[in-house]
Amino acid sequence: MSNKTAWWKKSVVYQVYPKSFCDSNGDGIGDLNGIRKKIPYLAKLGVDVLWLNPIYASPQVDNGYDISNYREIEPTFGTMEDFENLLAEAHEAGLKIILDLVVNHTSDQHPWFQESRKSKDNPYSDYYIWKDEVINNWGSSFGGSTWEYAEERAQYYLHCFAKEQPDLNWENPKVRQEVYDILRFWLDKGIDGFRMDVISLLSKDQSFPDGPVIQNKAYGSYYAGCANGPRVHEFLQEMNREVLSKYDIMTVGETPHTNADEAALYTDESRKELNMVFHFDHMHLDYDENGKYATNRVPLVALKKVMTQWQDKMHECNGWNSLYWCNHDQARAVTRFGNDSEEYREISAKMLGTCLHMMQGTPYIYEGEELGMTNADFTKLEEYKDVEALDIFKD
């Protein structure tokens, strides 16, 4: 199918964070049957695609982004039958469903890692990235070093996120084939595509260079050796050739530390990688030494410049934009980009919605964004059920 007529170019995507969306059984946690209950609402809202955050089996250290079994549903959310019913009912209502694909890392409880950590000579020994010593200054996104010692193997493994999320070794062709089999499993069930978590980090610079130390941090940034690495486009082209191109689906990659020129390489139709990417240029405009937890206002002129740059570049390179103001990793749009006071909340939400939907690209709406939801008013640390926030606080 040509990109000029691709269905995802005419779609609006609604992001569902299952835990907090709708609870069907009264246990205080959202679930798949809760999402099913809301299909009439979502269809009436006028969205076209539902993006579900991870629903796979997981210890939930990072709210499902630590996957222990890619072919099972997290019991908290329901069963595979529940998912299949949700998919069928969504399709019947004219809604498509895409799933979160998390394959930069797994849970440390995944059978691959449980085997890999046992020894240096078992079939899974090089499914992950192991070193005899801490070889660089990289710091994890969630605080501390990216290197964790495993006594059983007497080596260190790499984890760009929590220590319970070891990074997969994409240099190993067996790992890539395992991932492609997982893709086929879900695509053969009839899902309509994937949002690919931190997909720009798959290929590590095999020299593992030290990263720059900024803002008085204790560690260097791992992005210097991970983001947009030397083989990432090769890997994605292989994935597209072997799996993605065989289905009528949409793909969007989360690509931290990727500028518009680099994004063109991921999204140019002729390169056969991804349909679009999530960039972070507009997300970083209010950063200071506290990063995403800064309380600065977003500078309007700088925001306009960034959005214009991405509009122009994606049009120029025959790529496609993903348009978003917020998601599960970011502050609420009205609070961050508008004014969440009683006087201005509604008009701020309408202004942001108008801006989002009038640009070229596929709009993404985070659950509640259509209502003008604002940041949660948490006053106690224990109210935060987020490993990143808690680890950064401790760090």
PLM feature spans:
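Active-site and adjacent substrate-binding regions of carbohydrate-active enzymes
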Residues: 1-395
